[in-house]
Regions:
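RNA/tRNA-interacting regions in translation and RNA-turnover enzymes
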Residues: 1-241, 245
Length: 245
């Protein structure tokens, strides 16, 4: 699971199925509910904490760390694999509350693309099959009730040109943004941008973000520095002369 997290950026967690009572669910902790973590730390939870639980109680602190009760051991033969996405702010609050910031929570608190779960799951299955060819998958549950909506932004090409100091055609902008996964459509001067899911978690949300992407891909070093020219028609007073000295 750690390898998959490092390879994809998506945390995963494995439970020993033989130590799970009934069904696995995601729920808020009961006030004062106890949990012993993998690292040996015992927590007294609050109702603000999101947990992974079975029919008998809490088995993991969602997005932070699993519990000791159902941890994977050398003799484990049945595994439940969790590949999940959690709300960033809640995970950060929980990790800070218990002074237990982990590799998983550090990623979740930055708002991970939910679509990345598929990538992490596919890699996990590939590794299971390579390492344990006799493995059998006996069930799959997929809950995605509110799919992430891709951000959509309207930007005028003339607006980009004024700020970047470059004449831009639709082809110029498309050449810079489409390789990054952006979908573009043009209507005269207006450009409609559909942001890919992996950039729709708050990273790209306003037209200034689009301008930054175009400038970045164009290359900041390719923008020529030009001095600001202006004229001063007012009389020079004594204070101005004193400041010049």
């Amino acid at each position: 699971t750690n390898y998959v997290m490092l390879a994809t950026g998506q945390p995963t967690h494995a439970f020993d199925s033989d130590h799970i009572a009934g069904h696995v669910i995601v729920r808020r902790a009961g006030e004062g509910e106890k949990l012993l973590l993998l690292n040996g730390k015992e927590l007294t939870l609050t109702s603000d904490d999101l947990t992974i639980a079975d029919d008998a109680g809490v088995v993991g602190l969602a997005g932070v760390m699993g519990g000791a009760k159902d941890s994977i051991l050398p003799e484990t033969s049945k595994v439940i694999l969790e590949v999940a996405n959690f709300q960033a702010a809640g995970i950060r609050r929980t990790a800070l509350r218990y002074d237990n910031r982990t590799e998983a929570s550090a990623r979740y608190e930055k708002a991970i693309d939910p679509e990345r779960c598929d990538q992490a799951f596919d890699l996990s299955m590939q590794l299971f099959q390579e390492l344990y060819p006799e493995m059998q998958v006996t069930g799959l549950a997929d809950q995605y009730p509110v799919p992430l909506k891709k951000a959509e932004i309207d930007v005028a090409l003339s607006w980009l040109e004024r700020r970047l100091g470059k004449v831009l055609t639709p082809d110029d902008v498309a050449a810079k943004l489409e390789p990054l996964g952006f979908q573009l459509s043009f209507d005269g001067d207006n450009m409609h941008v559909v942001v890919p899911t992996w950039r729709s978690t708050g990273d790209v949300s306003i037209k200034a973000d689009i301008m930054e992407e175009v400038a970045r891909m164009y290359g900041y070093e390719n923008f020529e520095a030009e001095p600001i020219t202006t004229s001063f028609d007012g009389a020079i007073n004594q204070l101005d002369k004193d400041l010049e000295r």
